[in-house]
Amino acid sequence: GRGERHDQQCKYQDNVRRGLDWLTAQEVGIGDMRGKGNMYDHGIAALALVEAYGVTKDPDLRPMAQGVIDFIVDSQHEEGGWRYKPGERGDLSVSGWMVMALASGEMSGIPIPKKTWEGVRGFLEIVGGGKDGGSYGYTDSPGKANSGKHAMNAVGFFCAQLTRSSANAAKAFESALILEGAGFNLADIYYAYYGTLAAYQHQGPVWRKWIKKMQAEYL
């Protein structure tokens, strides 16, 4: 948010550099950032690395940025999502981090296969539901036992925005209504994170209401 980077003099240059040094040292295989964890760890680490490359275009980061993206592409399930292990049938929570990393990679100049994006859009259809497809569940469409939570609606809405799957006005309106109805809630930090991303992308009254309450909570 501040534009701090490891390759130019700035207030937190050393912190960012040391953080990147530590992060790159965690690679356990070509492009594999899971460490002793799972695909959650990989997705979050991949997002950080690709963002660092995208901001700086540091050629030393390019091979690793490409590697972590390739690992995501190769780990995608045939239905288009991701879960704890490579190739496992997806859930929307883990998949959200992969979609963010892929979108960041594409914006940074790393090519993403068309088939990968088609898979993501297909997965969003699987976990989508509601009247116009703008409500999202965890591993299945809302209405089933493990679906329909506010956080998952926010993740699905944001992923749809990143993949341009929310171009359908009715679908986007339904997603926005759910987000607006739930409102900002700092007690659920995961929902607050994704809800902020989705509300900001959507803009309009939904974002204005969201940011007003968020500022009151934080400031």
Feature locations, PLM:
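An alpha-helical repeat/solenoid feature that recognizes helix-turn-helix modules
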Residues: G1-N15, G29-D70, D74-G119, I126-L177, ...
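Patatin-like phospholipase
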Residues: L23
